[in-house]
Amino acid sequence: MVHPYLFLNFFRELLHPLGFSEAGADAVVYTWLIMIGLVVLSIAATKRLQAVPSGLQNFMEVIVGGIENMLVETMGEHGKPFFPLVATLALFILVSNLIGLVPGFFPPTANINTTAACAVVVFVTTHIVGVKHHGAGYIKHFLGPIAWLAPMMFFIEVIGHLSRVISLTLRLFGNMNGHELVLIIFFGLAPFIVPLPMMLMGVLVSFIQAFVFMLLAMIYIQGSLEHAH
């Protein structure tokens, strides 16, 4: 699903020979735009660090500090090594959600490939961390406490872990894509006044979806660190 008109529309023509659809090309372009923007923002915020923060540094410290506090409350102090991953995902998803509210911009999270990529990152990280922390004993997470039920529990647990990828992917994609559809319909009916309440709702949805994805990522990683019972 794409906007009626798009900023940086000419990139479609560049990516079309590579086999990208219009929606896929838009997602790639805006994903790179957001990543570059976040890098520039981080450089600008840390270029002249001050003991008493102000301006952009203060704004970014509030955001980053909030994410770090939530991570510590959810995972404990041993969760701090995962802060870069969690914060990066949270900021990328939040900005990706919000950028769709700007007329002519496409939110990458309204493309299922983007949300699937984020979900796979969480899935792979979860199990790499589990294996690294527990070694071969990580398999106990999939076997359950009763030995004779282990084969069945293993199958159930594998399905459960794979379903995490599907749920993370579809929850974010469904909410953002659905919101995009509603916005386009309202913009078609009344371009200036009617969409405003939906845009305000979109801001709320954008924050909630980024928060939920970040929280679930922390919970899944924390689960892989715990000892199996």
Curated annotation (Swiss-Prot):
The keyword Membrane applies. It holds the Pfam family ATP-synt_A. The keyword Transmembrane applies. It is found in: Cell inner membrane. The chain crosses the membrane at residues 25-45, 82-102, 104-124, 142-162, 181-201, 202-222. Gene3D superfamilies: ATP synthase, F0 complex, subunit A (1.20.120.220). Signal peptide: none annotated. Keywords: ATP synthesis, Cell inner membrane, Cell membrane, CF(0), Hydrogen ion transport, Ion transport, Membrane, Transmembrane, Transmembrane helix, Transport. Belongs to the ATPase A chain family. NCBIfam families: ATP_synt_6_or_A (TIGR01131). Key component of the proton channel; it plays a direct role in the translocation of protons across the membrane. This is ATP synthase subunit a. It comes from Citrifermentans bemidjiense (strain ATCC BAA-1014 / DSM 16622 / JCM 12645 / Bem). The gene is atpB.
